[in-house]
Amino acid sequence: EPLDRGTRIVIHLKEEYAEFSQDYRVKELLRRYSNFVAFPINFNGEHINTVQAIWSKSKSDVKPEEYDEFYQFISHTDEKPLSYMHFSADAPIMLHSLLFIPRRNPEMFGFGRVDPNVSLYCKRVLIDAKPEGLLPDWLRFLNGVVDSEDLPLNISREMLQDNSLVRKISDIITKRFIKHLDKLAKDEKETYKESLGKLLRFESTATDPGETTSFEEYITRMKEGQTAIYALTGPSRAHLENSPYLEAFKARGYEVAFFTDHGDEFVLDSLSSVDAKPVTMIDRADVELPELETEQK
């Protein structure tokens, strides 16, 4: 039958793709890929895209409760976020981003290593729910959205991994997030310092390669009389294990935390302490160690 307005698109499906004619599958795909498009999508009389893309709005137009509701929607939780970062950039590429710091890290509860829950969009259309390389490894606890109009809508996962735009987006987000941490450390230090510290995961001299631990677990393993958390930054675990600074701490049985990601040193400087234990970089000149105990003969 003729339409008064608009366009009718008829799709003929092969037998092996019959599932895409099922109502539940069509709604699932619409909500997954087009949940935030600007125009209303109706399916058999049901309004599908009911959640607003608040990341595309100005911060002044978004209420605090809207941030909380959006975080709960994308992270499937009833909790409010610890903090959020909402920003736009137009150089070197155009993007809108809304990132949330959760109150707790799933890795704390034995769920193993988690992937970042930050989705990549182009003009509010989902490109990849978990794009590789979008965030550095140390930011994998984040939840949120990154939307760039400069990305092609038909870009594949393989192209994303080698795309220079994604690397530029990663650099922008990392720098912005470090500034955000710096602001929290200065303006709301007591509120956020301990919580941020508990989100971090790292390898150490007490873990096998690839196995991570937390500051809380580190503190339970501290030797009697040890007053500080010892840490070392570098490009890789292998590099750190060969550090000349490490020998004196291993000789005294002190665990040393390894941080190998971009921005780690800045984050540790902002953190300063966890549970009243100062985080001390072992390659600094002012580190004091007790004398080694000598064997009684």
Q: At which residue positions do the language-model features occur?
A:
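Conserved GHKL (Bergerat-fold) ATPase module
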Residues: E1-K297
